[in-house]
Swiss-Prot record:
This is Allophycocyanin alpha-B chain. Pfam families: Phycobilisome (PF00502). The gene is apcD. Disulfide bonds: none annotated. Keywords: Antenna complex, Bile pigment, Chloroplast, Chromophore, Electron transport, Membrane, Methylation, Photosynthesis, Phycobilisome, Plastid, Thylakoid, Transport. Contains one covalently linked bilin chromophore. Its main location: plastid. CDD domains: APC_alpha. Belongs to the phycobiliprotein family. The modification N4-methylasparagine is found at residue 71. It is found in: Plastid, Chloroplast thylakoid membrane.
Amino acid sequence: MSLVTQIIVNADDELRYPTIGELQSIQDYLTTGSNRIRIATIIRDKEKEIIQKASKQIFQLHPEYIAPGGNAAGSRKRSLCLRDYGWYLRLITYGVLAGDKDSIETIGIIGVREMYNSLGVPIIGMLDAIQCLKEASLEMLGQDDIRIISPYFDYIIRGMS
């Protein structure tokens, strides 16, 4: 649900008009609309480059993942990791475009920690991978865009912690 929709639903549930603070949140969201679209476009267009940088960084941090017997050993396991990285980048752009974290919660974070645990994927590695994706993504963006996108990466990191 978008920020605007969430504010309207909350106000309607409470049989009231949106508060001054809620209206200000809507105004802030609307004035950053072109930034949000630009961020989503950059992340989409630079996805392969971002994933390449992030994967290089994560495998330098955790070389044991690509060593024989590691969770990303071999081309098949490694490609599954990289697929997940693309999935997280898409989740981030959904949140950025919606202006809230509900889409991330609904689509992706619920149960992800349990799934990784059941598959034997080290959570610390996923947390580090999301941080690496964040750093690689931020290299592509300006300061205004960084302020918009960073909380969505941080939300996923906190949700998986």
